[in-house]
């Protein structure tokens, strides 16, 4: 069979990184240093190298862009996205990952490689919509590069859907906590927990 007749996409990985900080759920974004979307917020992401394992690629890209070292026990595949024209430069397929920073895993994030800066943003679902804030600034769909807003939404919905039977988001919490703290954590993804 002639494989040359088939087009070959570039493969990327995107990382949705969560942590628990001052009783809030946060996600780590970068500001892009280069075009396309220069100056926009983005997930830590990059191209998978030839013959590179996907988990290795996720950890490498996050380390290169943010200086954060992920624990491979706390990452999991979220979704594969191949929407046409998602990257204006070329045809790409991305594998997005959920990544959980343990509460006691204190690391200094520092921008490098394709990142101009790093930002821990508060994230929550409010009235059924994604709310993303960087200090006093509220972010909207067009503030994020590529389809990263949609990937964040998918991440929030995935975690919400698994709160009852597989709450991997607990990986970001301190080992000992109160029922109120767990309700607040779960309420970040599903507001009904805040009314209990």
Regions found by a protein language model. Name each.
Residues 1-42, 55:
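N-terminal strand-loop-strand
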Residues 7, 72, 89, 194-195:
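Short, surface-exposed helix-loop/turn micro-motifs enriched in polar/charged residues
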Residues 49-53, 177, 194:
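A generic structural signal for alpha-helix starts
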Residues 173-186:
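Short acidic, hydrophobic short linear motifs in intrinsically disordered regions
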Residues 188-196:
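Short, positively charged loop/turn segments that connect secondary-structure elements
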């Amino acid at each position: 069979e002639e494989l040359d007749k088939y087009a070959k996409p570039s493969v990327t990985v995107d990382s949705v990184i969560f942590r628990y900080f001052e009783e809030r759920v946060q996600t780590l974004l970068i500001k892009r240093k280069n075009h396309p979307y220069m100056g926009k917020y983005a997930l830590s992401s990059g191209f998978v190298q030839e013959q590179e394992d996907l988990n290795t690629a996720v950890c490498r890209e996050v380390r290169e862009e943010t200086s954060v070292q992920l624990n491979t026990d706390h990452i999991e595949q979220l979704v594969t996205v191949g929407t046409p024209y998602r990257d204006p430069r070329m045809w790409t397929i991305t594998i997005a990952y959920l990544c959980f920073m343990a509460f006691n895993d204190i690391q200094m994030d520092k921008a490098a490689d394709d990142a101009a800066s790093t930002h821990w943003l508060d994230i929550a679902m409010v009235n059924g919509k994604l709310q993303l804030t960087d200090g006093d600034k509220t972010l909207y769909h067009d503030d994020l590069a590529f389809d990263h807003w949609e990937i964040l939404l998918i991440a929030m919905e995935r975690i919400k859907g698994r709160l009852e039977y597989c709450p991997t988001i607990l990986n970001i919490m301190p080992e000992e906590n109160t029922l109120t703290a767990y309700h607040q954590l779960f309420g970040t993804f599903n507001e009904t927990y805040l009314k209990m």
